[in-house]
């Protein structure tokens, strides 16, 4: 415990909150161009081929982003929109693609949680 005199000389430091998504620079989303689209394997105990892309953002950052949903149409030079949100079992993946925006197509035949995957409302039968 510091003495009152020590606190008068040097007050307590505020704890500075560190951003979980620094590349977005306090923006809700950022645009970027895919430089590499590939699959990677998750940490133990999970097993899959997760679809990810390396993206160069408009501010110069190069980040890895997760492509959610079943199937995608992305390739190198696709223009995409990124949002924050990490993938717990993929180290280094701190961003998600926004499906149904720019060059990223929405998920086909998606019935539930459609707004998260850029899927239009299905026609009533």
UniProtKB/Swiss-Prot annotation:
The modification 3-methylthioaspartic acid is found at residue 89. Residues 105-125 are annotated as: Disordered. Residues 113-125 have a biased composition (Basic residues). The keyword Ribonucleoprotein applies. SUPFAM superfamilies: Nucleic acid-binding proteins. InterPro entries: NA-bd_OB-fold (IPR012340), Ribosomal_uS12 (IPR006032), Ribosomal_uS12_bac (IPR005679). Keywords: Methylation, Ribonucleoprotein, Ribosomal protein, RNA-binding, rRNA-binding, tRNA-binding. One of its GO terms (biological process) is translation. CDD domains: Ribosomal_S12. One of its GO terms (molecular function) is rRNA binding. Belongs to the universal ribosomal protein uS12 family. With S4 and S5 plays an important role in translational accuracy. Part of the 30S ribosomal subunit. Contacts proteins S8 and S17. May interact with IF1 in the 30S initiation complex. This is Small ribosomal subunit protein uS12. It comes from Methylobacillus flagellatus (strain ATCC 51484 / DSM 6875 / VKM B-1610 / KT).
């Amino acid at each position: 415990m510091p003495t009152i005199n020590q606190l008068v000389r040097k007050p307590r430091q505020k704890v500075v909150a560190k951003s979980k998504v620094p590349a977005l620079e306090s923006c809700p989303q950022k645009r970027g161009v895919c430089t590499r689209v590939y699959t990677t394997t998750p940490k133990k105990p999970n097993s899959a081929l997760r679809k990810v892309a390396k993206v160069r953002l408009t501010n110069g950052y190069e980040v890895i982003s997760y492509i959610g949903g079943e199937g995608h149409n992305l390739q190198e030079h696709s223009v995409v929109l990124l949002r924050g949100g990490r993938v717990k079992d993929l180290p280094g993946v701190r961003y998600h693609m926004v499906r149904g925006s720019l060059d990223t197509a929405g998920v086909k035949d998606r019935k539930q949680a459609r707004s998260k995957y850029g899927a239009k409302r299905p026609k009533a039968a």
